[in-house]
Regions:
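Short loop/turn segments immediately following beta-strands, especially the blade-tip
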Residues: 35-43, 88-95, 136-143
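Surface-exposed loop/turn positions within WD40 beta-propeller blades
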Residues: 29, 72, 81-84, 129
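Beta-rich, blade/repeat-based domains predominating
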Residues: 4-21, 52-72, 106-121, 153-163
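C-terminal hydrophobic structural anchor segments
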Residues: 86-136
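Blade-level signature of beta-propeller repeat domains, shared across WD40, Kelch, NHL, RCC1
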Residues: 127-133, 145-163
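Acidic, glycine-rich loop-and-beta core segments that form the ion-binding/anion-interacting portion
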Residues: 1-53
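Beta-propeller fold detector
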Residues: 1-2, 44-52, 96-104, 144-152
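Conserved beta-strand positions in repeat-built beta-propeller and related beta-rich domains
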Residues: 16, 24-27, 77-80, 124-127
């Protein structure tokens, strides 16, 4: 059991591929909390908290989605308000996150996104723009590059890949 700091607003959580770390996106204070998970006891220990927004951003924002890259080396979070995706390197041994990039999502209010099973693509759906945007993921660095590919959709609640 772990109690988030008051006002954080935990929204979603994803385990690392090895199951040793839990990354929680906090909707209200725009942070990601990283916890160590002890499978034997079920215990969670705080390892660190990182902000998903640039330091100079002063507008309204809530974070929405969090995903761990299939390689385990990167974590992604969407910012509704800043209209961006924050990219973090994930240190495998400690689980700690280091900010790498913040990139425009290509629409308003990025609600949900998914990584392809092979980790090559990230597709982002938006709450206030009827659009799916596609990013290529650099396998070595985790950084995103917006592609010219997109699709108009009337409403986007969830993005998922199926085998």
């Amino acid at each position: 059991q772990f109690a988030a700091k008051p006002g954080a607003g935990p929204r979603h959580a994803k385990f690392s591929a090895d199951g040793r770390h839990l990354h929680v996106v906090n909707e209200l204070d725009n942070t990601i909390t990283t916890l160590a998970y002890d499978a034997a006891t079920g215990g969670l220990t705080l390892l660190g908290i990182v902000n998903t927004l640039p330091a100079d951003f002063t507008g309204a924002n809530t974070t929405a989605e969090i995903r761990v890259h299939p390689s385990g080396g990167f974590v992604y979070a969407s910012n509704r308000g800043h209209d961006s995706i924050a990219v973090f390197a994930r240190e495998e041994a400690s689980g700690r996150l280091q900010h790498l990039q913040t990139i425009a999502s290509g629409g308003r209010t990025p609600r949900n996104f998914a990584l392809s099973p092979d980790g090559r693509w990230l597709v982002c759906g938006h709450q206030d723009t009827p659009l799916l945007t596609v990013f290529e993921v650099d396998a070595a660095t985790g950084r995103l590059t917006r592609t010219p590919h997109s699709a108009e959709v009337p409403v986007c609640i969830c993005v998922a890949f199926f085998d």
